[in-house]
Design a protein with these regions (language model features):
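Intrinsic structural disorder
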Residues: 1-24, 28-29, 48, 53, ...
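N-terminal secretory targeting modules
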Residues: 1-53, 60-66, 218-305
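Short, charge-rich amphipathic segments
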Residues: 6, 10-18, 33-43, 67-79, ...
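Conserved SGNH/GDSL esterase-like catalytic core that processes O-acyl groups on lipids
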Residues: 49-54, 59-134, 162-164, 259-264, ...
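Residue-level marker of intrinsically disordered, low-complexity segments enriched
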Residues: 86, 119, 177, 181, ...
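Surface-exposed patches in mature extracellular/periplasmic domains of secreted proteins
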Residues: 87-93, 154-155, 228-230
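Alpha-helical cap/lid subdomain in secreted, periplasmic
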Residues: 105-226, 282-289, 293, 297, ...
Length: 305
């Protein structure tokens, strides 16, 4: 091969390499864009890594489970890994005795630099009906604002046993936002088993009950993957009061408060919004006198058994 032919061949190879490189760059860019635009259900189908957040009460924490690994969320994590063959991380911030307001606080206070793709929320058992509509919607708004591309699944707790006023309130909020519902009430009722066979204490699902929780959430996910749906509706809030929760500031007792004596703490701060207190669980009555600008604001008492 003479030099002219060699130069021609070299030019052709360079052109081919440049074309292949360009195609690879375009492919990577398209994949990156798809990953950014996909919601949770499409990410599962496309094999992308997903991050799941669980915000619930004691049932969400796996209370009632008799065998480690049988917790509904651990079964779900194992299943999801078989679906997309990629990384599936689950962050569970559920706590026993929590109400919807606590779920809002946990969501807003979470600072782990993870962009969640799916949030599973479940409250109602410990909530009073008064305020539930605002607090539950505050969780939805918190997730929507903090993780704009995050899908939500709402679990209707089997411990309610029927469609109580709390459950109806939650269903109404989910309908408004287009949030898929995992109905463990009907799942327990249609299981062919007595309720006492699914819960040893009448509230928390045992191993058999955990299996039903897992299957119910799994079915919701499978249906949305198959239909390529599941994104929340971009709608206005139902209750305007929910926007009082938009501004969230966490003041920690260890660094923001000044201890005056064994029972008195002071905080110098300027803020507006809904005031809440995070209690340490102590049996009996837990009373706090709250003063704002030197005047008694409120004296709430919380009782823990």
């Amino acid at each position: 091969m003479n030099k002219k032919d060699e130069d021609k061949k070299s030019a052709e190879l360079q052109a081919l390499n440049a074309k292949l490189y360009q195609e690879e760059q375009e492919k990577e860019a398209a994949l990156k864009q798809k990953k950014a635009e996909d919601i949770f259900y499409q990410k599962l189908s496309d094999g992308f890594d997903v991050n799941v957040l669980v915000v619930r009460d004691s049932i969400g924490a796996g209370a009632g489970t008799e065998t480690d690994g049988q917790q509904w969320f651990k079964q779900l994590q194992a299943y999801l890994r078989t679906v997309n063959k990629a990384s599936v991380s689950v962050t569970n911030v559920s706590m026993g005795g929590n109400t919807s307001y606590a779920g809002y606080v946990q969501t807003m206070a979470l600072d782990d630099d993870i962009d969640y793709d799916l949030a599973v929320i479940c409250y109602g058992q410990n909530d009073a009906l008064q305020g539930l509509d605002v607090y539950y919607e505050a969780i939805v708004q918190a997730i929507k604002n903090k993780y704009p591309n995050c899908s939500i699944i709402s679990i209707l707790e089997s411990s309610q046993r029927d469609y109580t006023s709390n459950i109806i309130t939650i269903q109404s909020i989910c309908d408004h936002y287009g949030i898929p519902v995992a109905d463990t009430i009907v799942a327990f009722n249609n299981s062919g088993k007595a309720y006492d066979d699914l819960s040893n204490d009448g509230v928390h699902p045992n191993d058999a009950g955990q299996e039903i929780y897992y299957e119910t959430v799994k079915n919701v996910i499978d249906e949305n993957v198959a239909a390529s749906t599941g994104k929340m509706e971009n709608v206005d809030a139902i209750n305007a009061d929910v926007h009082k929760f938009d501004n969230f500031i966490w003041y920690g007792a260890d660094k923001d408060f000044k201890r005056v004596d064994d029972t008195t703490f002071t905080l110098n701060a300027s803020a507006s919004g809904v005031f809440g207190i995070d209690y340490t669980f102590e049996s009996g009555d837990n009373k706090a006198d709250i003063y704002v600008d030197g005047e008694l604001f409120e004296s709430p008492t919380v009782t823990f058994e």
